[in-house]
Amino acid sequence: MAEVFDRVKEIIIDRLDVEESKVTMEASFKDDLDADSLDVVELVMELEDEFDMEIADEDAEKINTVGDAVDYINSKA
């Protein structure tokens, strides 16, 4: 799980230009990391590419925190 978190964290830092210390499992994309809805869509697309998977739209809507993304990826691995 740590490896997935590290990869997700790196993508978030690059995409949202946030400090590494802000990216925690509990961090909300919108509330804590100042991402707008377009940022979240782009993050989901980048996660799909990074982890070679497809994230259904209805599943993507449920990914609100870094932890949600990590848990989703781990559940599909």
UniProtKB/Swiss-Prot annotation:
Subcellular location: Cytoplasm
GO BP term, pick one: lipid A biosynthetic process
Post-translational modification: 4'-phosphopantetheine is transferred from CoA to a specific serine of apo-ACP by AcpS. This modification is essential for activity because fatty acids are bound in thioester linkage to the sulfhydryl of the prosthetic group.
CC annotations in GO: cytosol; membrane
Pathway: Lipid metabolism; fatty acid biosynthesis
Pfam families tied to this protein: PP-binding (PF00550)
Amino-acid biosynthesis listed as a keyword: no
GO molecular function: acyl binding; acyl carrier activity
Residues the record lists as O-(pantetheine 4'-phosphoryl)serine modifications: S37
Protein's UniProt keywords contain NADP: no
Keyword vocabulary terms for this entry: Cytoplasm, Fatty acid biosynthesis, Fatty acid metabolism, Lipid biosynthesis, Lipid metabolism, Phosphopantetheine, Phosphoprotein
Domain Carrier: 2-77
Family: Belongs to the acyl carrier protein (ACP) family.
NCBIfam families: acyl_carrier (TIGR00517), PRK00982.1-2 (NF002148), PRK00982.1-4 (NF002150), PRK00982.1-5 (NF002151)
Function: Carrier of the growing fatty acid chain in fatty acid biosynthesis.
Protein name per the record: Acyl carrier protein
Organism the protein comes from: Oceanobacillus iheyensis (strain DSM 14371 / CIP 107618 / JCM 11309 / KCTC 3954 / HTE831)
Gene name of this polypeptide: acpP
